Every structure is written in C-alpha cells, then in structure tokens.
Amino acid sequence: MAIRKYKPTSPGRRYQTCSTFEEVTTDQPQKSLLGTIKKTGGRNNFGRITSRHVGGGHKRRYRFIDFKREKLDVPGKIASIEYDPNRSARIALVSYEDGEKRYIIAPAKVAVGEKIVSGERADIKAGNAMPLRNIPVGSLIHNIELKVGKGGQLIRSAGTYGQLMAKEGSYAQVRLPSGEMRKIFIDCRATIGQVGNNEHENISVGKAGRTRWAGKRPKVRGVVMNPVDHPMGGGEGRSSGGRHPCTPWGVPTKGHKTRSNKSTDKYIVKRRG
C-alpha cells in the first residue's frame, strides 16, 4: 500500500492524503456475506446519548468476518483483497475447496491466489491459523482469541501485530501492540503474521468533513462550555478552567487511570506503557 497526496487546490486538499488502494482487487463484495448496519446516532433505546460524538456518516454494509477460523484442515485460496468501510484493515475473501467462501482479516504480504489453512499442524505462514501451543516462540501473530472458540478479539487493526514471547504450562505469554504482556490460554487460536494496510497510520484526514463522513461528530472542549454543562465551564473571557482537567461528570482525565479491577487482571504479566 502507498499513500496518495493531492495538489493544494483548496485548504482542505492541501494536507489531505489517502490510500492508493493498489492492493484492493475488486470493488464488488460477496453479497452472501453482507449484512445491514442500523445507525443509532449514539443513542440507546431510551433515546439518550450513551456514546458522545457519534452520528451521521456514509451508509455502510457490514461484512461478516470469520474471526473464529474454525474451518479446520480445509485449504482455501485467496480470491480477492477488498476494502471494508467498517475497519482500518483490508479483508480477504477466501474460497475453500468445499465451495464455501468466507472473509478474513487480510494479513500483510498475502496476495491473491495464495493458499491458507487453519488447523493444528498448519505451516508457519502468514494467514494460517492454529493454536498458540503449535506456534514457535518469537512469531508475529494477530487475531488472537481470549477464550477458546470465541473468535479472535485482539490485534485486528491495520498494521498491528503481537509477538509470542514464551510458553509456560497452560499459558502463552504474548506481547500486545500497546506493550502489555499478557498470559493467554495455550489452546486459543491465533493467525500468523502482521495485519496488512500498515500505512493506515500515516493518512492525514485533511478536513473536518472527511471525519464527518466516518460518522464522527465534533468534540467540544469543556472550558468553552457554560458552568451548567461542564465542571470546567464558565468564567469571563478565555479562562483556563480553574481546576484539574476532568470529564463532564467530574472524573479526572489526562492521565488519570479509570480502569476498574477485573478478575482477569491475574493474566497481565506487565502493564502497557
């Protein structure tokens, strides 16, 4: 993938960049693997805002992705690499020998026509999926399960990868993109390789409207609100807030830890950061 720059024909175009989409081979998705997405505008069933800064955006069709990779020992061929509006990574359409077709997250350096397989003793090759117990220490992996058979939940964004660091008893130690070191049950499945589209992080949006196309609404700073709307609001002229930075509900922010204790904390070997 490469980054395309535009001539500065307008202020919004001046610093705007986008993908060249050279790795995408078709713009026609597999109809049998499409679903609908209903927009909520960030509201729940009472009509109250539960997710701020959400609303609008271009209409999308959902692509059903095979995160479980439970189709064991059936070889499949990469039929196409496609754009998915619902995620930063590209997706690959896999055509299996029994005739079934499924989408998977497209790994880096996987091309149309290559064969992949999911199984206990699959080759150590990008796109193949297998339990952590059969993956060599030091391998780069993505789409990692946290519970056996639940499907991959970790490391699915464009350009990300984890590294299998060690195996001890029933658990494998995996270094996540955040830097966190985590123990994961050794029978959980993962996919070999790095997620593709690793230039995604270098894309410059360029203008506010392009963010609105993505379904994101503006974020208003607390210090420019009125006192009724935010703890840091009010004051004559441009005031600095008068208190430590906080959320609209008074919870400290900008570095304050808000993560609650969980029963799964025991699986974290080393915190991120």
Curated annotation (Swiss-Prot):
Biased composition (Basic and acidic residues): 262-273
Renumbered residue ranges of the record's region Disordered: 223-273
InterPro entries: NA-bd_OB-fold (IPR012340), Rib_uL2_dom2 (IPR014722), Ribosomal_uL2 (IPR002171), Ribosomal_uL2_bac/org-type (IPR005880), Ribosomal_uL2_C (IPR022669), Ribosomal_uL2_CS (IPR022671), Ribosomal_uL2_dom3 (IPR014726), Ribosomal_uL2_RNA-bd_dom (IPR022666)
Alphabetized UniProt keyword annotations: Ribonucleoprotein, Ribosomal protein, RNA-binding, rRNA-binding
Highest taxon of source: Bacteria
Record carries keyword rRNA-binding: yes
Coiled coil: none
A GO molecular-function annotation: rRNA binding
GO biological process, alphabetically ordered: cytoplasmic translation
Assembly behavior: Part of the 50S ribosomal subunit. Forms a bridge to the 30S subunit in the 70S ribosome.
Family under the similarity heading: Belongs to the universal ribosomal protein uL2 family.
Name of the protein described by the UniProt record: Large ribosomal subunit protein uL2
UniProt organism field: Syntrophus aciditrophicus (strain SB)
Taxonomic path: Bacteria, Pseudomonadati, Thermodesulfobacteriota, Syntrophia, Syntrophales
Gene (UniProt): rplB
